[in-house]
Structures are given as C-alpha cells and as structure tokens.
C-alpha cells in the first residue's frame, strides 16, 4: 500500500494517446471518456498491484478496465445505464475473462 508520504505528484504533462487504445475504447464516442494512457499513468503512480480502485462515476469503464489490465481490482458504477452497458461490453471483449467478476456482481445484486 502506498502511504501519504510516498505520493509524488505527476508534474509533467501526459499527452493523450487516443489512437493506440482505439481497439477497445473506440467502440462508442461517450462524452466524458478520458484518454486511457492518462488514466493508466495515474493508476501506475497512485496504486499498486492488488489494490482496489473505486470509480463511482465510471462512465464507460476506462478506469476500471485499465485497473484490471494493471493487476488492480476495480469497482465501477455510473448512473447512466447506457454507460454501464458500454462498460460491460467493452470489458467482456477486452479482459481475459469476466465470468467470475460477473458472477460475483450478480450475487451482490441479489
């Protein structure tokens, strides 16, 4: 776990690299989407493998998917059902296997 004294701010600009992530994030032009490489840089700086990342305003899941790809666990939600639909479908086609996650989610839903 990263302690408060270990946190160093990101001082350099992180240019958005939208093109290299088009395969899984170019599915739909959602209005609040953030560049995945910028989200990834923050996750790498401010979390460690195995940490839980919470994104309560998850949109189409960029933060959650990048967290999973970096070995973090993630919780994401959005008020917009369309955003959740997009996030679920991107996760289903991007992540190796979401079956255990989906089963856990369905148990929590019940």
Which residues does each predicted region cover?
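S-adenosyl-L-methionine-dependent nucleic acid methyltransferase catalytic domains
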Residues: 1-110
């Amino acid at each position: 776990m990263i302690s408060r004294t270990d946190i160093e701010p990101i001082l350099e600009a992180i240019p958005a690299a939208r093109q290299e992530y088009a395969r899984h994030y170019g599915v739909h032009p959602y209005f609040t989407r953030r560049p995945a490489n910028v989200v990834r840089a923050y996750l790498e700086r401010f979390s460690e493998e195995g940490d839980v990342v919470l994104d309560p305003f998850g949109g189409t899941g960029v933060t959650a998917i990048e967290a999973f790809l970096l070995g973090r666990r993630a919780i994401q939600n959005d008020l917009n059902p369309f955003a959740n639909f997009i996030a679920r479908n991107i996760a289903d086609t991007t992540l190796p296997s979401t079956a255990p996650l989906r089963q856990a989610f369905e148990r929590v839903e019940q």
